[in-house]
């Protein structure tokens, strides 16, 4: 915030200093400060550690709501070469950083960095595209963090024994993981599909290749979590909170999961009907 304010003051004083201040350099400092506030690479160093110390609801705010203002300001600056560097680093670091994580909050943090790379790439194309992407990403993140918050899940080994007799909840949780990763035909594929179409029209094939490869890596560690949790034998965890399966929170989660899994079909049907 200090860097952002300082560079803004420099930009305002530019005319009073006989143009001795380079405007593009000042804009680059402002852009770097905004990327730092949003948690984009290479200014992401604070984001996973901050996520690890937050509750799930506060982590959700950090992953979604706190990104709106920086991204809106970035869309007005739109320094393409700096955005391009941040997009490439964000999708790569977000994918590779989540490979060996055992903490669910850090896993979601690196997933957020990867998705932020997709949102920044959509900023280079159209403001409406990134708003659509941000809306779907926020919804899918809310579904997962809502469930993690209900059952107090913070580490992967808790998933292995989590509600061993409730295969439905386990199955829906992992379907939401795959939807967040952008696997078709789930809802999370729709915003990625829009970005892929627009990047193809702009002939950004190399950038698109890197982004799709990073998505495959994120899907790999999501699938690894799913496979391990379904194949591991049951063992007792004293910190697992027992809950009544027929509760309002669980019912709300199942309703949101329905839209997460079948939302793409419903949107496609609505589009072809009207």
From Swiss-Prot:
GO CC annotations, alphabetized: mitochondrial inner membrane
GO biological process: mitochondrial electron transport, NADH to ubiquinone
Coiled coil: none
Transmembrane segments: 28-48, 54-74, 79-99, 107-127, 128-148, 171-191, 206-226, 254-274
Membrane topology per record: Multi-pass membrane protein
Documented EC number(s): 7.1.1.2
Catalytic activity, as annotated: a ubiquinone + NADH + 5 H(+)(in) = a ubiquinol + NAD(+) + 4 H(+)(out)
Cell compartments where the protein resides: Mitochondrion inner membrane
Keywords associated with the record: Electron transport, Membrane, Mitochondrion, Mitochondrion inner membrane, NAD, Respiratory chain, Translocase, Transmembrane, Transmembrane helix, Transport, Ubiquinone
Alphabetized InterPro entries for the sequence: Complex_I_Subunit_2, NADH_DH_su2_C, NADH_UbQ_OxRdtase_chain2, ND/Mrp_TM
MF-aspect GO terms: NADH dehydrogenase (ubiquinone) activity
Entry similarity comment: Belongs to the complex I subunit 2 family.
Cited function: Core subunit of the mitochondrial membrane respiratory chain NADH dehydrogenase (Complex I) that is believed to belong to the minimal assembly required for catalysis. Complex I functions in the transfer of electrons from NADH to the respiratory chain. The immediate electron acceptor for the enzyme is believed to be ubiquinone.
Protein name as catalogued: NADH-ubiquinone oxidoreductase chain 2
């Amino acid at each position: 915030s200090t860097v952002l304010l300082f560079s803004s003051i420099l930009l305002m004083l530019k005319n009073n200093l006989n143009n001795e201040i380079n405007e593009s350099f000042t804009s680059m400092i402002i852009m770097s400060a905004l990327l730092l506030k949003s948690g984009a690479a290479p200014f992401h160093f604070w984001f996973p550690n901050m996520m690890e110390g937050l509750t799930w609801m506060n982590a959700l705010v950090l992953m979604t709501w706190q990104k709106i203002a920086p991204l809106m300001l970035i869309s007005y600056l739109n320094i393409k070469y700096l955005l391009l560097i941040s997009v490439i680093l964000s999708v790569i670091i977000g994918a590779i950083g989540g490979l060996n994580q055992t903490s669910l909050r850090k896993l979601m943090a690196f997933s957020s960095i990867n998705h932020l790379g997709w949102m920044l790439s959509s900023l280079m194309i159209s403001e409406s595209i990134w708003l659509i992407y941000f809306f779907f990403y926020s919804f899918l993140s809310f579904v997962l963090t809502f469930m993690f918050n209900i059952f107090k899940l913070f580490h992967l080994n808790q998933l292995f024994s989590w509600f061993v007799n409730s295969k439905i909840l386990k199955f829906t949780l992992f379907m939401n993981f795959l939807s967040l990763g952008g696997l078709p035909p789930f809802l999370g594929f729709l915003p990625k599909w829009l970005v892929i179409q627009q990047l193809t029209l702009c002939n950004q094939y190399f950038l698109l290749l890197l982004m799709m490869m990073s998505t495959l890596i994120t899907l790999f560690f999501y699938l690894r979590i799913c496979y391990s949790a379904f194949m591991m034998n049951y063992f007792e965890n004293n910190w697992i909170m027992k809950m009544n399966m027929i509760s309002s929170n669980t019912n709300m989660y199942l309703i949101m999961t329905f839209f997460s899994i079948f939302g793409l079909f419903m949107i496609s049907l609505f589009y072809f009907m009207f």
